[in-house]
Amino acid sequence: MGLLHCFHIHASAEKEALVVAVVWHIEIAPEAGDAFERLYGADGEWTALSRRSRSFLGSSFLKDLAHPERYLLIEYWSEMLVYEKHLADFGAEVQSLEEERARLVVRMEAMGVFSALDVPDRVGPTWSRRSG
């Protein structure tokens, strides 16, 4: 499942957004939790690839407490065009990680691209940065 075709953004909305939040709803296969969390967690391969872009600001990776097979992934980017370029520039690596993800995920839904109205500082446990 490629990412570029999932979002259609009105040009004027893109210009207004200082920080965009790309939001995904993900349901994983039973027993896939540990592997999925390693892939998308702060030290995971997906986050490491995203960090290679100057536009990547961080991510929030959320697990549903009532339904442990459900997750939300929110990636914060400073520019939508650079996000799209990042996906294109690293297409082979993105494809490889998407294939790995396909073995773990039952359903992945692109919820949309949102304008981040109140963004926390780039530190803390919800952001994809680790120190030490």
Predicted regions and their residues:
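Short, surface-exposed ligand-recognition loops at beta-strand->loop->(often short) alpha-helix junctions
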Residues: 27-40
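Short, Lys/Arg-enriched N-terminal segments with co-localized hydrophobic residues
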Residues: 6-18
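Acidic/histidine-enriched, glycine/proline-rich intrinsically disordered or flexible terminal extensions
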Residues: 113-132
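The identity of the second residue at the extreme N-terminus of proteins
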Residues: 2, 20-21, 132
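An amphipathic, aromatic/His-enriched active-site/gating alpha helix that lines ligand/cofactor pockets
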Residues: 2-4, 41-58, 76-113
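Residues embedded in well-ordered secondary-structure elements
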Residues: 13-15, 48, 62-63
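Short, well-ordered beta-strand segments in beta-rich or mixed alpha/beta enzyme
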Residues: 20-27, 57-89
